[in-house]
Amino acid sequence: METVLSLLNEFGFERTVEPLSDPIVVHAVPGSGKTTLIKQALIRNNNIEAVTFGVPEKANIHGTYIKKARQGQRGRGNYSILDEYLSGEYSTGFNCLFSDPYQNHGDCLRAHFIGRCSHRFGRQTVQILRDLGYNIASSKEDIVEKKNIFQLIEPEGVIICLEKGVEDFLKWHSVEYKFPCQVRGATFDIVTFIHEKPLEELVGPDLFVALTRHRSKLVLVSN
């Protein structure tokens, strides 16, 4: 436990008023350093094991990588970490649970630590997210552009949509696109998000994923 608690402090995660208990619950926004923290825990303490319901790491020569979790998995070893605990069914034996409630449906546990500062996207995106009700911050700057669909001559970066009408429009124009479920866990330099309804009417895990995949620029396109 001491290794994880030390790293949570080093990475700037905020302690909540929830009394410490087993398992430790950590909620973190995209780009907060969650995955890097878990990898550091594996390197620093060989008694720690980590598995995830998200995207697992590729095996390395040392064996210190985040492995894929199985449905119904039980924690093993002296200290077990489960990443993305909200994305699957798990059993007992885990000592530390990580996830992001904003990207998941359903109820979450009370957090002992939160990481709400993203180092991926910047303050322009954060302002949009905060206006939508998300408790999030950023350590950097980025660019957010808003365009009308008829101004969209050459879409930039990876195009994401979640509405059927937008999907049909993009198919009609033979434009390649992705759904939020296809890019969860991914990061791109530039993302173009195309939507019909106002963002306020789309609030939910899919929208949050779509608006948090970029590093430098987010283009919001509507009609």
Swiss-Prot record:
Keywords from the named record: Host cytoplasm, Host-virus interaction, Inhibition of host innate immune response by virus, RNA-binding, Suppressor of RNA silencing, Transport, Viral immunoevasion, Viral movement protein
(+)RNA virus helicase C-terminal domain location: 137-223
Cellular component terms (Gene Ontology): host cell cytoplasm
GO MF entry, a single one: RNA binding
Residues of the (+)RNA virus helicase ATP-binding domain: 1-136
Keyword set includes Transport: yes
SUPFAM superfamilies: P-loop containing nucleoside triphosphate hydrolases (SSF52540)
InterPro entries according to UniProt: (+)RNA_virus_helicase_core_dom, P-loop_NTPase
PROSITE patterns xref list: PSRV_HELICASE (PS51657)
Primary site of residence: host cell
Keyword RNA-binding annotated: yes
Subcellular location: Host cytoplasm
GO BP annotations, alphabetical order: symbiont-mediated suppression of host innate immune response; transport of virus in host, cell to cell
Assembly information from the UniProt record: Homodimer and homooligomer. Interacts with capsid protein. Interacts with host AGO1; this interaction targets the host protein for degradation, thereby suppressing the antiviral RNA silencing.
Further remark: TGBp1, TGBp2 and TGBp3 seem to act together for cell-to-cell propagation. TGBp1 is the main movement protein that physically cross the plasmodesma with the viral genome. TGBp2 and TGBp3 would facilitate TGBp1 function.
Function: Transports viral genome to neighboring plant cells directly through plasmosdesmata, without any budding. The movement protein allows efficient cell to cell propagation, by bypassing the host cell wall barrier. Increases plasmodesma size exclusion limit. Acts as a suppressor of RNA-mediated gene silencing, also known as post-transcriptional gene silencing (PTGS), a mechanism of plant viral defense that limits the accumulation of viral RNAs.
Protein family: Belongs to the Tymovirales TGBp1 protein family.
Name by which UniProt lists this protein: Movement and silencing protein TGBp1
Organism: Apple stem pitting virus (isolate PA66)
Organism phylogeny: Viruses, Riboviria, Orthornavirae, Kitrinoviricota, Alsuviricetes
